[in-house]
């Protein structure tokens, strides 16, 4: 029924088409992120009917990012429920529970209509994305942004500069990332995975449609994104 496998660069167009249909706004709904960070949780993928399904693992238990590729209108919801029932059987055959992540508040409501009290919902604040009003970040008014105003003041007091990344900068960025990793906690698995993610981002930079920038202090790189 399902044939999960590691994500590949050749999956870009098909995955992006599914992501465009659903248009979810979490960082996990990015082909570039899915590809580059796949080693963080042993993520595997499958295409089932019109759905793009991403399955990761935590302490050996599978969890599925809320699938994309089908709209959540009335007919689409029926397809989702049908898929979830099949995934429930798939995980049950593994002796594991069925779990979804990145479920929107809207999806929770219609899932409750079907599953009732059998549906358990938990908020994972540590996984929330940060969302700011652009006008707030432009003005930085009030006590809430006092710290950010101080950061900007410190920035202006030093010989700081910013530049957009080009392929000519990738070697310097890679060396900076390696130095940062060497000074980090080697027991932090995510730090090691980050090195692989950076490698993938730079290897397929243009193909993934990425943009980046670097900060310099006194002519020396201080960070990049």
Model-based region annotation:
Residues 1-49, 189-190:
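Amide-forming acyltransferase catalytic core, primarily the GNAT-like/NAT-type
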Residues 30-99, 106, 216-225:
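Conserved donor-binding loop and adjoining core beta-sheet/short helix segment
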Residues 85, 105-112, 153-156, 178:
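A broadly conserved amphipathic alpha-helix scaffold signal in soluble, globular proteins
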Residues 86-94, 112-114, 120-123, 154:
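Short, charge-rich binding segments
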Residues 96-114, 125-128:
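Short, glycine/charge-rich beta-strand/loop segments that flank catalytic centers
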Residues 97-103, 131, 161-166, 214:
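A structural signal for short, well-ordered beta-strand segments and their strand-loop junctions
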Residues 116-189:
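Acyltransferase donor/substrate-recognition loop-hinge adjacent to the catalytic core
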Residues 168-221:
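Short, conserved active-site entrance elements at the starts or edges of catalytic domains
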